């Protein structure tokens, strides 16, 4: 909050790197949801099951230390909460069941060092559809960094008029590999491509580069125009508060 006040006082534009807002298929999903493609959401489910920390021989680091910001909530949860707030609406009360599956890892000196940062988090919350206080959508978020052969990142939105699914099984890249499907009531899922105006002009082997470059472009435009940067500190604070609530359970 102090950073927000400082930025406003000094008329500075501040960006937060929530790069999924800049990924074409995520932007397409947002466009579809806003247009009413699934009607009013009734249930939202997000599974983000990765294997990056499943090897118990992987060394202890800041990621293993809760006080240093480690854990799956800080790594994946911050993006998950922001994505849900952007696509559906503000995050409400949060309840979580957190677990440390690998309680020790080899430290720099070779000795086993205790791990207190969660590597599994099962989270329940509500989302205010398009910010409406009279339309609360139940949401389930499952995060893991120790899921061997995990299914990757999958978002499912079930609504009054249809279903939207956005997902990727890619365990090596957090951006490449996503696909999007949509089904109207009574119809099978069909694959959806991103609209041409959402495509990246250039892509790289590391999938993170293109969306980060797009975020930087938005940031530069914010500085030129004087308009607020989104995602910025306000979005960062909202996600951080949700993460703190989940981690405190």
What role is predicted for each listed range?
Residues 155, 171-190, 202:
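Short polybasic amphipathic segments
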Residues 191-207:
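C-terminal "lid/loop" region of Rossmann-like NAD(P)-dependent oxidoreductases
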Residues 10-15, 20-115:
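Predominantly a Rossmann-like dinucleotide-binding segment in NAD(P)-dependent oxidoreductases
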Residues 68-74, 202-210:
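A short glycine-threonine-serine/GTX helix/turn-capping micro-motif
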Residues 1-6, 213:
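Beta-loop-alpha module in the N-terminal Rossmann-like domain of NAD(P)-dependent dehydrogenases
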Residues 81-176, 213-225, 244:
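Contiguous beta-strand/loop segments that form the cofactor/metal-binding neighborhood of enzyme cores
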Residues 9, 13, 34, 132, ...:
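C-terminal helix-rich "cap/oligomerization" subdomain common to oxidoreductases
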Residues 3, 29, 245-246:
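Aromatic/hydrophobic pocket-lining residues that form π-stacking "cages" and hydrophobic walls in ligand
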């Amino acid at each position: 909050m102090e950073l927000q006040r400082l930025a406003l006082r000094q008329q500075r534009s501040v960006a937060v790197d929530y790069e999924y807002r800049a990924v074409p298929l995520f932007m397409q999903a947002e466009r579809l949801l806003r247009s009413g493609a699934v009607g009013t959401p009734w249930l939202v489910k997000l599974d983000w099951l990765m294997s990056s920390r499943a090897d118990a021989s992987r060394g202890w680091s800041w990621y293993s230390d809760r006080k240093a910001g480690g854990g799956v909530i800080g790594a994946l949860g911050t993006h998950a909460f922001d994505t849900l707030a952007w696509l559906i609406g503000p995050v409400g009360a949060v309840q979580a069941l957190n677990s440390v599956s690998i309680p020790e890892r080899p430290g720099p000196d070779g000795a086993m060092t205790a791990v207190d940062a969660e590597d599994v988090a099962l989270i329940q919350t509500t989302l205010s559809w398009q910010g409406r206080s009279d339309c609360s959508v139940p949401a389930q978020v499952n995060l893991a960094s120790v899921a061997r052969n995990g299914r990757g990142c999958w978002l499912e939105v079930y609504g009054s008029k249809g279903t939207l699914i956005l997902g990727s099984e890619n365990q090596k890249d957090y951006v490449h590999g996503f696909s999007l499907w949509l089904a109207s009531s009574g119809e099978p899922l069909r694959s959806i491509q991103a609209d041409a105006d959402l495509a990246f002009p250039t892509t790289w082997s590391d999938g993170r580069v293109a969306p980060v470059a797009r975020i930087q472009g938005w940031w530069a435009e914010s500085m030129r125009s004087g308009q607020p940067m989104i995602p910025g500190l306000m979005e960062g604070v909202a996600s951080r508060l949700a993460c703190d609530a989940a981690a405190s359970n």
